[in-house]
Protein backbone atom coordinates (compact mmCIF):
# COMPACT_ATOMS: atom_id res chain seq x y z
CA UNK A 1 0.00 0.00 0.00
CA UNK A 2 1.27 3.47 -0.79
CA UNK A 3 0.09 6.72 0.72
CA UNK A 4 0.55 10.46 0.46
CA UNK A 5 -0.75 13.20 2.72
CA UNK A 6 -1.01 16.79 1.57
CA UNK A 7 -2.69 19.75 3.19
CA UNK A 8 -5.72 19.31 0.92
CA UNK A 9 -6.04 15.55 0.47
CA UNK A 10 -5.15 12.10 1.75
CA UNK A 11 -4.35 9.61 -1.02
CA UNK A 12 -3.78 5.89 -0.65
CA UNK A 13 -3.77 2.94 -3.00
CA UNK A 14 -3.62 -0.82 -2.82
CA UNK A 15 -3.44 -3.50 -5.50
CA UNK A 16 -5.51 -6.69 -5.33
CA UNK A 17 -5.32 -9.79 -7.49
CA UNK A 18 -8.94 -9.88 -8.63
CA UNK A 19 -10.83 -8.51 -11.65
CA UNK A 20 -12.00 -4.91 -11.38
CA UNK A 21 -15.68 -5.90 -11.13
CA UNK A 22 -14.98 -8.12 -8.12
CA UNK A 23 -12.79 -5.46 -6.48
CA UNK A 24 -15.58 -2.88 -6.81
CA UNK A 25 -18.29 -5.25 -5.60
CA UNK A 26 -16.37 -6.26 -2.45
CA UNK A 27 -15.66 -2.64 -1.51
CA UNK A 28 -19.25 -1.47 -1.95
CA UNK A 29 -21.26 -4.56 -0.99
CA UNK A 30 -19.07 -5.78 1.88
CA UNK A 31 -18.17 -2.40 3.37
CA UNK A 32 -19.53 -3.58 6.71
CA UNK A 33 -16.61 -6.04 6.88
CA UNK A 34 -14.13 -3.31 5.98
CA UNK A 35 -15.27 -0.59 8.40
CA UNK A 36 -14.37 -1.39 12.02
CA UNK A 37 -17.52 -1.50 14.16
CA UNK A 38 -15.85 0.64 16.83
CA UNK A 39 -15.70 3.50 14.30
CA UNK A 40 -19.17 4.81 14.99
CA UNK A 41 -21.15 7.88 15.98
CA UNK A 42 -23.89 6.00 17.83
CA UNK A 43 -22.31 6.66 21.22
CA UNK A 44 -22.41 3.69 23.57
CA UNK A 45 -24.66 1.70 21.24
CA UNK A 46 -22.92 -1.06 19.32
CA UNK A 47 -23.07 -1.10 15.52
CA UNK A 48 -24.64 -4.30 14.18
CA UNK A 49 -24.24 -3.43 10.49
CA UNK A 50 -22.87 -0.83 8.12
CA UNK A 51 -24.73 -0.45 4.83
CA UNK A 52 -23.80 1.23 1.54
CA UNK A 53 -26.87 2.11 -0.50
CA UNK A 54 -25.43 1.46 -3.96
CA UNK A 55 -26.98 4.34 -5.88
CA UNK A 56 -26.50 8.07 -6.31
CA UNK A 57 -28.51 9.75 -3.56
CA UNK A 58 -28.10 6.76 -1.25
CA UNK A 59 -26.27 6.83 2.06
CA UNK A 60 -23.71 4.94 4.05
CA UNK A 61 -25.15 4.30 7.46
CA UNK A 62 -24.58 2.36 10.65
CA UNK A 63 -27.44 0.53 12.33
CA UNK A 64 -27.24 0.07 16.09
CA UNK A 65 -28.53 -2.72 18.31
CA UNK A 66 -31.78 -0.83 18.99
CA UNK A 67 -32.38 -0.15 15.29
CA UNK A 68 -31.05 3.42 15.50
CA UNK A 69 -29.59 4.56 12.17
CA UNK A 70 -26.69 6.98 11.76
CA UNK A 71 -26.28 8.24 8.17
CA UNK A 72 -22.71 9.54 7.98
CA UNK A 73 -22.13 9.74 4.22
CA UNK A 74 -24.07 10.42 1.02
CA UNK A 75 -23.39 8.59 -2.25
CA UNK A 76 -22.53 11.32 -4.77
CA UNK A 77 -21.25 9.19 -7.68
CA UNK A 78 -21.81 5.47 -8.30
CA UNK A 79 -20.23 4.16 -11.52
CA UNK A 80 -19.59 0.40 -11.29
CA UNK A 81 -16.98 -0.93 -11.67
CA UNK A 82 -14.94 2.25 -12.11
CA UNK A 83 -15.52 4.54 -9.13
CA UNK A 84 -17.74 5.86 -6.45
CA UNK A 85 -17.67 9.09 -4.48
CA UNK A 86 -19.19 9.78 -1.08
CA UNK A 87 -19.52 12.80 1.14
CA UNK A 88 -17.80 12.68 4.55
CA UNK A 89 -20.50 14.12 6.79
CA UNK A 90 -18.38 13.99 9.93
CA UNK A 91 -17.07 17.18 11.53
CA UNK A 92 -13.62 17.88 13.03
CA UNK A 93 -15.16 17.07 16.45
CA UNK A 94 -16.25 13.66 15.08
CA UNK A 95 -19.95 14.57 15.15
CA UNK A 96 -22.43 14.40 12.27
CA UNK A 97 -22.18 17.37 9.92
CA UNK A 98 -25.59 18.43 8.60
CA UNK A 99 -24.36 21.21 6.28
CA UNK A 100 -23.33 19.61 2.94
CA UNK A 101 -21.07 22.59 2.16
CA UNK A 102 -18.95 21.62 5.19
CA UNK A 103 -18.44 18.00 4.11
CA UNK A 104 -15.34 16.58 2.45
CA UNK A 105 -15.41 13.89 -0.24
CA UNK A 106 -13.95 10.42 -0.58
CA UNK A 107 -13.42 9.01 -4.08
CA UNK A 108 -12.54 5.36 -4.54
CA UNK A 109 -11.38 4.44 -8.06
CA UNK A 110 -10.81 0.95 -9.43
CA UNK A 111 -8.22 0.63 -12.21
CA UNK A 112 -7.77 -2.69 -14.04
CA UNK A 113 -4.02 -3.27 -14.36
CA UNK A 114 -4.68 -6.67 -15.98
CA UNK A 115 -7.78 -8.83 -16.30
CA UNK A 116 -7.08 -10.26 -12.82
CA UNK A 117 -5.34 -7.38 -11.05
CA UNK A 118 -6.88 -4.10 -9.86
CA UNK A 119 -5.38 -0.97 -8.33
CA UNK A 120 -7.74 0.66 -5.84
CA UNK A 121 -7.09 4.36 -5.35
CA UNK A 122 -8.66 6.23 -2.43
CA UNK A 123 -8.61 10.02 -2.23
CA UNK A 124 -10.12 11.94 0.70
CA UNK A 125 -10.29 15.53 -0.54
CA UNK A 126 -11.77 18.97 0.14
CA UNK A 127 -10.91 18.56 3.81
CA UNK A 128 -10.67 22.33 4.21
CA UNK A 129 -14.48 22.50 3.74
CA UNK A 130 -14.80 21.30 7.34
CA UNK A 131 -13.64 24.73 8.49
CA UNK A 132 -11.75 25.32 11.70
CA UNK A 133 -10.04 22.14 12.85
CA UNK A 134 -10.08 20.47 9.41
CA UNK A 135 -6.51 19.31 10.03
CA UNK A 136 -7.77 16.91 12.71
CA UNK A 137 -9.98 15.23 10.10
CA UNK A 138 -7.01 14.91 7.73
CA UNK A 139 -4.78 13.55 10.47
CA UNK A 140 -7.44 11.14 11.70
CA UNK A 141 -8.21 9.60 8.33
CA UNK A 142 -4.50 9.42 7.41
CA UNK A 143 -3.61 7.76 10.73
CA UNK A 144 -2.88 4.00 10.62
CA UNK A 145 -6.29 3.48 12.29
CA UNK A 146 -8.06 5.48 9.55
CA UNK A 147 -8.14 4.77 5.81
CA UNK A 148 -4.97 2.62 5.95
CA UNK A 149 -6.82 0.23 8.29
CA UNK A 150 -9.86 0.19 6.00
CA UNK A 151 -7.70 -0.72 3.01
CA UNK A 152 -5.94 -3.44 5.01
CA UNK A 153 -9.32 -4.90 5.99
CA UNK A 154 -10.45 -4.59 2.36
CA UNK A 155 -7.48 -6.69 1.21
CA UNK A 156 -8.40 -9.27 3.88
CA UNK A 157 -12.04 -9.29 2.68
CA UNK A 158 -10.83 -9.95 -0.88
CA UNK A 159 -9.18 -13.09 0.53
Residue ranges and their predicted role:
Residues 45-94:
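Glycine-rich portal/gate segments that line the openings of hydrophobic small-molecule binding cavities
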Residues 6, 41-44, 125-130, 143-149, ...:
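Structured surface interface patches that mediate subunit assembly and partner/cofactor docking
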Residues 94-145:
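Beta-strand/loop substructures that line and gate deep hydrophobic ligand-binding cavities in soluble
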Residues 28-32, 80, 152:
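Solvent-exposed alpha-helix faces
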Residues 23-27, 60, 75, 86, ...:
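Hydrophobic pocket/interface hotspot
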Amino acid sequence: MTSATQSEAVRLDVTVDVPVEHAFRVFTEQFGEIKPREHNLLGAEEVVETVVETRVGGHIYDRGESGTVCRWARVLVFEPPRRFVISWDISPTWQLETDPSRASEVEVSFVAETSDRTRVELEHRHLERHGEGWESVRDGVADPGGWPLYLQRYVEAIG
